[in-house]
C-alpha cells in the first residue's frame, strides 16, 4: 500500500458546525458570536428554541449574519485539499505538447487521447491557452458538439468531453464572437446538443454547458438565439431549484443574467415563471450569498418591463426582496434597492408600495441610509422615502425622534 493511501484529511475544528459537526457550507453567526451552518441553526430555531446551542445563552434576537470571512477560508481550504488530491493522482503526469498534437488527431476515436487532453488542460493556464490558440482544434470541438443526430450513450460521452474541454479553455479564446458564430450558425444543431446534455448530463456537465453558453452570449442576436433554443431556457429554469447543487444553480443564473437584456428574452423568462423560482430561492435559508446576489440581479433586470413588474408585485416577491436589503452583501443590497426603486418609485406600483409598508420595510430603508452605502444607492433610498412619506406619512412618524437627522426632506 502506498503511504498516501493512508492520508486522512484533518478538518480544522472551527470549520465544523457545532450542531452537525460537518464542514459548514454557509456559515452564519448569531448575536452570541458563535458561528453555525445556516441549515442547522435555522432548523434549531424553527424547532422553537431560543438559546444559542453552544453557549445556551438566551438569544435577544434570532437574526444571524453571514460569516463571509470564514466562508472564504473554508472555500480556500477545500480548494487546496482538491488540488492536493489531484496532484497525488497517478494520472497527474502532464502530456507534452507534441503528445497533445498527436492526441488531437485521435480525439474522435480514442478515449485515451481525450483523457490526455483533459489532463493537459487542467494543468495550467498556459496549457489552456495553447489549446485555445489552435483554431482547428476549437473548430473540431464545435463540430463534435453539433453532431446531435444520433445521441447514443457513447456519443453523449464524446460530446460531453468536447463541451468539458471547451468550457475549460473558453476564457483563453481571444475571439469570443468567432466562437459564438461557430456554435450558433450551424442550423441549431449545437443548441440541440446543449439541450440534451443539460437534460441528461451529470451536474458538472450541465455547469459546463451553461458556462459555454454564457461565454458565447456576446450581443443581442446571440442572446436571442440562445433564448429561442428549443426547450433550452425551460430546462435551465427547471434546474433553478433548492434541490439542485448550489454551483449548478449559480451557473444557470449567470447564464440567464447574460441573456436577459432584450425585452423578448425577458418575456420568455417571465412566461417560464422565473420570478416564482427566484422568490423560492430567496426564501430558502440555505441559499448561498452568491446565488442570492444573482437572483436579485435577475429580478432587477426583469423589473424593467411591465410584465416583470406584474409578476414581482404579485405574491411574496416584494416582501422577500425587502428581507434581503440587509445582512447579505453589498451587491445584494444594491440589487434589492434597485428592484424596490423600480417598482415603488419609478413605476409607482401600488401593490409593491403596500407590501413594503406592510412588513415594515421603511425601517430598513432608513437604517440603510445611515450605513456606508454608495451614492447611487443613497439616491434611490431617498427617492423611496419620498414615495412612502407621500403615500403613508404615518408609517414614518414613529422614527422622527431618532432618525430626523437623516430624513431627505
Curated annotation (Swiss-Prot):
Residue ranges constituting the U-box domain according to the UniProt record: 10-84
What does the record list as GO biological process? protein ubiquitination
Q: What InterPro entries does its record include?
A: ARM-like, ARM-type_fold, PUB22/23/24-like, RING-Ubox_PUB, Ubox_domain, Znf_RING/FYVE/PHD
Gene3D superfamilies assigned to the protein according to its UniProt record, in alphabetical order: Leucine-rich Repeat Variant, Zinc/RING finger domain, C3HC4 (zinc finger)
Key words, A-Z: Repeat, Transferase, Ubl conjugation pathway
What is the official name of this protein in its record? U-box domain-containing protein 28
Its EC number(s): 2.3.2.27
What metabolic or biological pathway is this protein involved in?
A: Protein modification; protein ubiquitination
Highest rank taxon of the organism: Eukaryota
Question: What is the documented function of this protein?
Answer: Functions as an E3 ubiquitin ligase.
Q: Name one Pfam family in it.
A: U-box
The reaction(s) annotated as catalysed by this protein in its Swiss-Prot or TrEMBL entry are: S-ubiquitinyl-[E2 ubiquitin-conjugating enzyme]-L-cysteine + [acceptor protein]-L-lysine = [E2 ubiquitin-conjugating enzyme]-L-cysteine + N(6)-ubiquitinyl-[acceptor protein]-L-lysine
- Molecular function, one GO term: ubiquitin protein ligase activity
- Does Repeat appear among the keywords? yes
Note the segments forming the ARM repeats: 178-218, 219-261, 263-304
Can the keyword Repeat be found in this entry's annotation?
yes
